[in-house]
Each structure stands twice: as C-alpha cells, then as structure tokens.
Amino acid sequence: MEKNFKVAALYCFADLKHYRQLQKPLLDLCQAKDIKGTLLLAQEGINGTIAGSCRAIEELVNFIKTEPAFQTPEIKYSWASKMPFHRMKVRLKKEIVTMGVEGINPLKIVGTYVDPEDWNALIQDEETLLIDTRNDYEYAIGSFQGAIDPGIKTFREFPEWVRKHEADLKKKKKMAMFCTGGIRCEKSTAYVRELGYEQVYHLKGGILKYLETIPKEESLWWGECFVFDERVSVKHGLEECGRELCRACRSPLNAEGKLSPHYEAGVSCDACYNKRSEVDRERFRERHRQIQLSKLRAMHSHQE
C-alpha cells in the first residue's frame, strides 16, 4: 500500500507568553501547504498531530523550530496511505494537554525519561509499578504486558485516580508510566513527583517510539496503539491496522465489530448502542446522511 502522507506527532513545553501571536502564521502556512490536523497553542507550549506531503511537513517543522522556545520539540514521524485528517485547526488553549491541575509544570519537575531500548528491563523489574495513563478505550485494544488500567474516560480523571489509590501505589519502589506519544506522561509524572514520589519514570517518545524502535520479537506490547486520527490504530513498525471509528462514540472498530447487529454506520456500535436513545440514533442517522450528501456534492464538483 502506497503511503503518500507523512504524519508528525509533536509537542514541546515552553514558557510561551506570546503564544496567541503564533496562531495565524501557523494556520496560514499549513493552509498554503495543504497540511491538515490540529495544533494546540498555550502559554505552556505546543502540541498536535498534522499530516501532509513529506516536503510540507519538513517546512512546517522547520518553521516551528524558528521559534526560540521550540528548538527541541519531541517529534514522532509515521506514514498514512490516505490523508488522516479532514481539516486544519490551530487552537488557543489553557493547557496543551488537559489535566486540570494548577501549577503542574514539566519544565520544573518531571519523571526520569527512559529510552525504548531500556524500557523492557524497567517494566520487568519486580519493584516497578507500570501504569497506562491513557483512556480506557485506548487500553482496550492494546497496552504493555502487566500494565495497570486506571479505567479513566479522560486525562482529567487521572489525578483523582492517583489520589484514590495512593496506598497501593506506594507498595512498589518505582513507578513507570507511558502514553501514546509522551506528552500525557510529562504531566502525570510531574504530578506524582509533586505528591512526593521519587522514583518515577516514563517512556521517552511514548508507545509510538517504542513500536517504531523495538523489534516485534523483543516487544512486551500486546495489541494495537490507538491514535487520534483516521488511521485509528497502528502496530509494530507504525503500520496501520485497518480499524474504523464509530462516528457516534468514537470507539475503535475492527471487522468483527462491524458484524454486530448493534453496528450501524455513523449511528451506533456495541460500545454505545445501549447508552443512547432512539432519538440520539435518529439524530446520528441524519448527520450521517448529511455527511454522505456533502461528499457526493464535493465529488460532483471535482468532476465538472
């Protein structure tokens, strides 16, 4: 399968008081180069995932690096067979990854970074408690062997989970955390360090860097890694897995899930069918019809 689109997942924490001034030039460049995706700007830095041609992504990354605060962004590259985003957004936010706890600053205090090559040894240590900081639907399709699933719906719930399980968390000497690309662990490890935990570690570059770097035969990862774009999930070597999203609840679906009697394209799946009313489903059906009509109109306009 030909992979025409380069995908860049990037973030950089910085003290960026003038972040509002960067919104327009970033959006203008992305639109001029036909780059799509989302970039978040806040006083604490930049975060996002974008996709485009190889040259366009290189130009954007070089432009970002011209900002003195963004000299060394954390970037993971991968490829997609089709454009994994529908539009380009550059948003101004309070946080570039939302934890909702005031005063957490990874520039001041953070866990110890562990390279993918050293990760297996750390998480196989009997004194290490391994925590998946992602959401429950991400954990459901893949994680590291032996990892604890906090069962959270959003990252905002993570601090409360830590506080509830503080007694259990202190039973092991070391705490190791991981997430998709590394940014959530910047905040989660900073948070637990502020609580007084000392031996706190996190996977540098996140799961994506591990799957890119570590051969499958040496890997302690099971399943797939959920990604927040139209690829839905990737596996070792950052290859696409062929999943789709339920457009009603955004749960990842494989071929088997689409055979369920509860599955209806754009309307429902096993994960959300019993959580929605028939009124909800009719609303989703109408939305799905409008989306399909919009696609048809776009296709006809290109043919004229």
UniProtKB/Swiss-Prot annotation:
Reaction catalysis annotation: uridine(34) in tRNA + AH2 + O2 = 5-hydroxyuridine(34) in tRNA + A + H2O
Residue ranges of coiled coil: none
Gene3D superfamilies registered for this protein in UniProt: 3.30.70.100, Rhodanese-like domain
Domain of life: Bacteria
InterPro entries recorded: Rhodanese-like_dom (IPR001763), Rhodanese-like_dom_sf (IPR036873), TrhO (IPR020936), TRHO_N (IPR040503)
Gene Ontology MF terms in the entry: oxidoreductase activity, acting on paired donors, with incorporation or reduction of molecular oxygen
GO biological-process terms attached to the record: tRNA modification
Residue ranges occupied by any Rhodanese domain in the UniProt entry: 124-219
First and last residue of the signal peptide: none
Active site: C179
Enzyme class: oxidoreductase
Keyword Magnesium carried by entry: no
Keywords in alphabetical order: Oxidoreductase, tRNA processing
Enzyme Commission number(s) of this protein: 1.14.-.-
Membership in a protein family: Belongs to the TrhO family.
General function of this protein: Catalyzes oxygen-dependent 5-hydroxyuridine (ho5U) modification at position 34 in tRNAs.
Protein name: tRNA uridine(34) hydroxylase
Native species: Bartonella quintana (strain Toulouse)
